[in-house]
């Protein structure tokens, strides 16, 4: 399971001209689900995303996680993160989970974030989405479990 996390000043996701999720300061989480992923990996990735210390403390050091910084999380499914790009000029998506399994794990990940009392907004699984963000830093990390 893969999360591309970006520290943002604000972010939103729109589907068919309808805003489905919007946050102020926090994390935009682009989530990719791979074939061998399961709930245990989703739990671990959620723990890492919410605990990753990429927000500045009083001294300006990256020492706070999103909850400590008072931020929110916007989770957007992105199957292209599971692409195999090692060869050729066209990505292969053979490493990605089947859509029904990917959706179940995406929803599970979102539920785990909410169970941690994290203000969590979402996109819409498998929809054609428009994602807008103001990257803060920029600060972007690739987390994989």
UniProtKB/Swiss-Prot annotation:
What keywords appear on the UniProt entry?
Answer: Cytoplasm, Hydrolase, RNA-binding, tRNA-binding
Question: What's the Enzyme Commission number for this chain?
Answer: 3.1.1.96
Chief location of this protein within or outside the cell? cytoplasm
Q: Reaction catalysed by this chain?
A: glycyl-tRNA(Ala) + H2O = tRNA(Ala) + glycine + H(+); a D-aminoacyl-tRNA + H2O = a tRNA + a D-alpha-amino acid + H(+)
The molecular function GO annotations come to: D-tyrosyl-tRNA(Tyr) deacylase activity; Gly-tRNA(Ala) deacylase activity; Ser(Gly)-tRNA(Ala) hydrolase activity; tRNA binding
**Where can the motif Gly-cisPro motif, important for rejection of L-amino acids be found?**
137-138
Can you state the subunit structure given in the record?
Homodimer.
The record's similarity note reads: Belongs to the DTD family.
Question: What is the protein's known function?
Answer: An aminoacyl-tRNA editing enzyme that deacylates mischarged D-aminoacyl-tRNAs. Also deacylates mischarged glycyl-tRNA(Ala), protecting cells against glycine mischarging by AlaRS. Acts via tRNA-based rather than protein-based catalysis; rejects L-amino acids rather than detecting D-amino acids in the active site. By recycling D-aminoacyl-tRNA to D-amino acids and free tRNA molecules, this enzyme counteracts the toxicity associated with the formation of D-aminoacyl-tRNA entities in vivo and helps enforce protein L-homochirality.
Designated name of the protein: D-aminoacyl-tRNA deacylase
Q: Which organism is it from?
A: Klebsiella pneumoniae subsp. pneumoniae (strain ATCC 700721 / MGH 78578)
From the UniProt record, report the name of the gene that encodes this protein. Answer: dtd
